[in-house]
Amino acid sequence: MPKMKTKSGAAKRFLKTANGIKHKHAFKSHILTKMSTKRKRQLRGSSLLHPSDVAKVERMLRLR
């Protein structure tokens, strides 16, 4: 039986760490002039994935 392939789109977007799965925030690529400075500041950096989404992403990354 062949090896299971990782979803390459998911591999580019998520990173497995000791504390969980890390991801970048959405809505931060273009047309940012209408967004407030506070909102853009809150979307900076990365955060951990919500526990309800972890199983789906682990399946895409073939961690499970």
Curated annotation (Swiss-Prot):
Keywords: Ribonucleoprotein, Ribosomal protein. The keyword Transmembrane does not apply. It comes from the Bacteria. Pfam families: Ribosomal_L35p. One of its GO terms (biological process) is translation. InterPro entries: Ribosomal_bL35, Ribosomal_bL35-like, Ribosomal_bL35_CS, Ribosomal_bL35_sf. Gene3D superfamilies: 4.10.410.60. GO terms for cellular component: cytosolic large ribosomal subunit. GO terms for molecular function: structural constituent of ribosome. HAMAP family: Ribosomal_bL35. PANTHER family: 54S RIBOSOMAL PROTEIN BL35M (PTHR33343), LARGE RIBOSOMAL SUBUNIT PROTEIN BL35M (PTHR33343:SF1). Belongs to the bacterial ribosomal protein bL35 family. This is Large ribosomal subunit protein bL35.
